[in-house]
Amino acid sequence: MSETAKKVIVGMSGGVDSSVSAWLLQQQGYQVEGLFMKNWEEDDGEEYCTAAADLADAQAVCDKLGIELHTVNFAAEYWDNVFELFLAEYKAGRTPNPDILCNKEIKFKAFLEFAAEDLGADYIATGHYVRRADVDGKSRLLRGLDSNKDQSYFLYTLSHEQIAQSLFPVGELEKPQVRKIAEDLGLVTAKKKDSTGICFIGERKFREFLGRYLPAQPGKIITVDGDEIGEHQGLMYHTLGQRKGLGIGGTKEGTEEPWYVVDKDVENNILIVAQGHEHPRLMSVGLIAQQLHWVDREPFTGTMRCTVKTRYRQTDIPCTVKALDDDRIEVIFDEPVAAVTPGQSAVFYNGEVCLGGGIIEQRLPLPI
């Protein structure tokens, strides 16, 4: 069997990126089939409509391309391995990233295993904007060619073995090119907007959705000087650096500068705010990260110079990383950084190569 006749199962989401990925792989001579994953049991009509519409779009694309579409239900795995952890993090006052967890537990674990074992796949493929490069017998994860759409931040937990079994066709293209291909092919997904909701749960009203699973506890909003200036509806609805949705204006004595969340006192259920997006209380000189995943799976010891992102779409921050023990590192930024948020991920890069990352355990505040 030639390399190009190998079987690839494409994770079809009903979006434009996975649609074009399937076509690109066909052009490269692979034997292509699609798989639609259902990872959330509908609990309302709106969600049912979204999932049903996505499945219909995925089916329409597969019909157009002449490929088979399989479906699988990973709702139990999603609930146990993604959603419960997501809720636990929010309950603890942290801000998790469900997309990273979802890629780790569902797309590149449950899907990868199902495709290989049940469907006889040689590879899986997704519509992620990342690239892979094989160097010295190990697969590396590279940023997507379209720097505006690069999704390597969300895939840092993957091992070189998982990357070796995965193909990322649109990672070599820019988004407008992908849409143009879909339009030229007459695919129903060509003009479909990118999804921005929680991984697999969709674009629902987040506050209302979270409130179904975690009872909100209203509490005080106080300034860094200790003045009470309002009430929050639940700490879980707020994250460091947040400006919108606080329901407070400028103070009489102060400026009209907007208020930002600078800290959360989880024990006392207090939200702490300050004025100005570069208030010293919002700045960090570094962070401690844990639950580390290095793509090459080699243990990290000593120190290294690299760049880091503490949130998606952030400009790379030059930093020095130092191993504290097997599963914790200290990261010191070259310049202070705003809104470093516990629960989010710190992801490290050496140029185009994504080295891996970890969960931000604590930030190292700017000494005041």
Curated annotation (Swiss-Prot):
Annotated residues that bind ATP are located at G11, M12, S13, G14, G15, V16, D17, S18, M37, G127
- List site positions: Interaction with tRNA: H128, Q344
- InterPro entries, per database record: MnmA-like (IPR004506), MnmA-like_C (IPR046885), MnmA-like_central (IPR046884), MnmA-like_central_sf (IPR023382), Rossmann-like_a/b/a_fold (IPR014729)
Active site positions, chain numbering: C102 (nucleophile), C199 (cysteine persulfide intermediate)
- What does the annotation say about its assembly with partners? Interacts with TusE.
GO MF: ATP binding; tRNA binding; tRNA-uridine 2-sulfurtransferase activity
Disulfide bridge positions per record: C102-C199
Might you give the EC number(s) for this enzyme?
2.8.1.13
Per UniProt, the keywords (alphabetical) are:
ATP-binding, Cytoplasm, Disulfide bond, Nucleotide-binding, RNA-binding, Transferase, tRNA processing, tRNA-binding
* Protein name, entry field: tRNA-specific 2-thiouridylase MnmA
Q: Which organism is it from?
A: Escherichia coli O157:H7
Q: Which GO cellular component term is one of those annotated? A: cytoplasm
Q: Name one GO biological process term.
A: tRNA wobble position uridine thiolation
Q: Which reaction does it catalyse?
A: S-sulfanyl-L-cysteinyl-[protein] + uridine(34) in tRNA + AH2 + ATP = 2-thiouridine(34) in tRNA + L-cysteinyl-[protein] + A + AMP + diphosphate + H(+)
As for family, the record states: Belongs to the MnmA/TRMU family.
| Span list, region Interaction with tRNA | 149-151, 311-312
Query: What is this protein's function per UniProt?
Result: Catalyzes the 2-thiolation of uridine at the wobble position (U34) of tRNA(Lys), tRNA(Glu) and tRNA(Gln), leading to the formation of s(2)U34, the first step of tRNA-mnm(5)s(2)U34 synthesis. Sulfur is provided by IscS, via a sulfur-relay system. Binds ATP and its substrate tRNAs.
Where do the record's region annotations for Interaction with target base in tRNA lie? 97-99
Subcellular location per the Swiss-Prot or TrEMBL entry: Cytoplasm
Top-level taxon of origin: Bacteria
Q: What class of enzyme is it?
A: transferase
